[in-house]
């Protein structure tokens, strides 16, 4: 029976910051948040922190977001390695064009033992999960049979790598949307804020909404001041959403 793949979002990279030694400025933050503040102050050369309300890094970033000076958020970035996500979900994810992606290739990686992602709505119903698993098993069996026959068909191809690639790219047509994929996603703070605003909404597909919430939790650990305006709430159906009165970019 097909193995179920749980969603997992792992932080694998984040911005470091090296303050120029000739600039008379210091801050109470480091990494991406410090870079954001530095970039903002560089615009006005306000190194002496003349405004008490923006003297701290958190205060400065709050002001940046309040006034809509979002461009300085683009200097800092975060990368996640995401597993336990369905192919159908990544089709929605990759529409966010300000992110950079590196995704598992079904042409190079065999899917004979691929896992499946249980769609929201089925995860609390064992009977429906059995139906899903049976369908996944059937499609995987068909995939395996096609793969073997296609490799035999392309036996005259002298390159073993090309032969396998040709077989896999044809056989994958029968794999379900629920097939697990794995993907590295990199985005700057502004792009991540936009993603959260769009995809953590109650109007978004539930799987990508869950992804957005998980990303938000990790982003809030990396750069609390940048994502502090988002609040996570639980709906009547038990799913979560995240909203912010300051996330106004469409």
UniProtKB/Swiss-Prot annotation:
Its cofactor is FAD. The active site is at residue 199. Belongs to the thymidylate synthase ThyX family. GO terms for biological process: dTMP biosynthetic process; dTTP biosynthetic process; methylation. Keywords: FAD, Flavoprotein, Methyltransferase, NADP, Nucleotide biosynthesis, Transferase. FAD binds at residues 71, 95-97, 103, 188-190, 194. The keyword NADP applies. It holds the Pfam family Thy1. It catalyses: dUMP + (6R)-5,10-methylene-5,6,7,8-tetrahydrofolate + NADPH + H(+) = dTMP + (6S)-5,6,7,8-tetrahydrofolate + NADP(+). It comes from Mycolicibacterium paratuberculosis (strain ATCC BAA-968 / K-10). Residues 7-233 form the ThyX domain. A motif (ThyX motif) lies at residues 95-105. Its EC number is 2.1.1.148. Catalyzes the reductive methylation of 2'-deoxyuridine-5'-monophosphate (dUMP) to 2'-deoxythymidine-5'-monophosphate (dTMP) while utilizing 5,10-methylenetetrahydrofolate (mTHF) as the methyl donor, and NADPH and FADH(2) as the reductant. Gene3D superfamilies: 3.30.1360.170, 3.30.70.3180, 6.10.140.450. This is Flavin-dependent thymidylate synthase. Binds 4 FAD per tetramer. Each FAD binding site is formed by three monomers. NCBIfam families: thyX. Homotetramer. The keyword Transferase applies. GO terms for molecular function: flavin adenine dinucleotide binding; NADPH binding; thymidylate synthase (FAD) activity; thymidylate synthase activity. PANTHER family: FLAVIN-DEPENDENT THYMIDYLATE SYNTHASE.
């Amino acid at each position: 029976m097909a193995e179920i793949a749980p969603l997992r979002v792992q932080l694998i990279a984040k911005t470091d910051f090296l303050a120029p030694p000739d600039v008379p400025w210091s801050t109470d933050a480091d990494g991406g948040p410090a870079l954001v503040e530095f970039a903002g102050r560089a615009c006005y050369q306000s190194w002496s922190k003349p405004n008490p309300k923006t003297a701290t890094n958190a205060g400065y970033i709050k002001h940046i977001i309040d006034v809509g000076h979002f461009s300085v958020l683009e200097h800092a970035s975060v990368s996640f390695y995401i597993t336990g996500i369905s192919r159908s979900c990544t089709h929605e994810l990759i529409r966010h064009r300000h992110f950079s992606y590196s995704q598992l290739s079904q042409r190079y990686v065999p899917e004979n033992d691929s896992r499946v992602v249980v769609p929201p709505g089925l995860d609390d119903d064992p009977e429906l999960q059995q139906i899903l698993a049976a369908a996944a098993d059937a499609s995987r069996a068909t995939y395996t049979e096609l793969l073997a026959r296609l490799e035999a068909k392309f036996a005259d191809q002298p390159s073993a790598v090309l032969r396998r690639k040709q077989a896999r790219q044809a056989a994958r047509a029968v794999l379900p949307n629920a097939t697990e994929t794995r993907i590295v996603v990199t985005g700057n703070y502004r792009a991540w804020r936009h993603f959260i605003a769009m995809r953590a909404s109650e109007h978004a597909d539930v799987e990508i909404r869950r992804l957005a919430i998980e990303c938000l939790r990790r982003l809030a650990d990396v750069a609390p001041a940048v994502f502090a305006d988002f609040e996570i709430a639980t709906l009547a159906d038990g799913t979560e959403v995240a909203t912010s009165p300051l996330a106004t970019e469409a």
